[in-house]
Each structure stands twice: as structure tokens, then as C-alpha cells.
Amino acid sequence: MQMNFTLSGKEIAFDIAHCTVAGWTGRDAHAIQHHIDELAAIGVKPPSSVPLYYRTASGMVTQQDRIEVVGKGTSGEIEPFLIASDGVLYLGLASDHTDRELEAHSVALSKQICEKPVAKEIWRFDEVADHIEQIEMRSWISEQDGDDWVLYQEGTIASIRPLSDLIDGSGLMSSAPAGKASVMLCGTLGAKGGVRPAKRFKMALHDPVLGRTIEHSYAINELPEIA
């Protein structure tokens, strides 16, 4: 799947052939258990081990500002987004938007059913590698049409397992053939007030060292759930 991004003000194209969603990637055992508990509260079974790497169709990645979902039981979550292409690594921003009702039945299936919104801007990973864990992640939600934004998630990449471990564990650098790209969503932070649906989702990845920010927001259009 061909997708264009913005790198240092210039457009760069990737042919995405392989997409992975890493789950249960919290570095702190208590943080992992917190995420397990908040998902258990909505019926999701605990993982068999941590972390886990879920394959999804590459066509699920989208830069649109609106996604369509079935029913009212979906929600987004901010995640670092990695692109590996021809031996070069890039960092971006994504939301692992997930059907929580389906997740209670199968996490793997729930990862496949919703599009994964990603920001258009990316950075070269080697530009941030020496301060990667200082990079800040925040998301906000608007639960109903017309509502103000409410802070939903907040933390740094240091809350997630080292990205180098996730890269190695997933085989990211070697998973796509020459000339193609592999991408990975790298895990999330706990939600303030618990996991819940919203009408709009906004997220930001801020580099306090180089003074720059990647942002993206999208609306969620709920399609009727017909039985």
C-alpha cells in the first residue's frame, strides 16, 4: 500500500507491505497490570505473555481525519509509530483504534477490524535516538459532539519497553522485502478515567529537546450495528 509522509518538510513515499501492532508493551510491571485491569473491566481476557505482536493488514493504516466504525464500542489510544524501509528507521505517531466489544472475544480480531489513524509527519529515528525516552505522548478525547477536549493519556516513551527491544522482538527491520516498508504501532499508555469511546480523538508526540511536535486528530463516525 502506497502512503506519503512528510519528512523535514519534504514528501517521502513508502510502499507498506507489513503492519504489526505491539501490545502489552508497558515497561513497568504495575503499568502493564493497570492496562490489563482496565481492559478486564470491559471484558478483555489477559494476555498469554507480554509483549505480543499482532499482524494486521497494511491497508488498515490511514491518514484520513475521519474513520468509520460499527457501533459505539470502539476507542483510540496513542502509540509511537515506526516505519522501517531499506534499512532506515523513522518515528511517527498513530492511534491503535480498537473495537473493545470484539476485543473481549479476540484481541487479534479486534486489531484487524478498525483503521489505524497515523499522522502525516515523521522524523528520522537517528535524530531522536539519543533522547527517545524523553519524547512526550498526549492524547485528548471529545466524548460527545460539541464537547471540549479532555486529556485522556499522558506520559513519555520511557513508559513503554525500549523501542529497540520491540524492533528486535517483532523482526521489524527484516519483515518487508527490498523496496517495501514495514510499520509497527508500539504500545500505549494508561487512560485517565478508564478506556471509553469518544466522538473525536486528538494526539501529539512532542520532542522537548529539538522543540518539535507531531499532531493528528480524527473523528469517529459510528455506523449502525444491525443484527
Predicted feature residues:
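Catalytic-core "active-site belt" of small-molecule-metabolizing enzymes
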Residues: M1-G179, G190-A227
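Loop/turn positions that initiate beta-strands
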Residues: K180-M184
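Glycine-rich anion-binding loop/nest that anchors nucleotide
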Residues: L185-L189
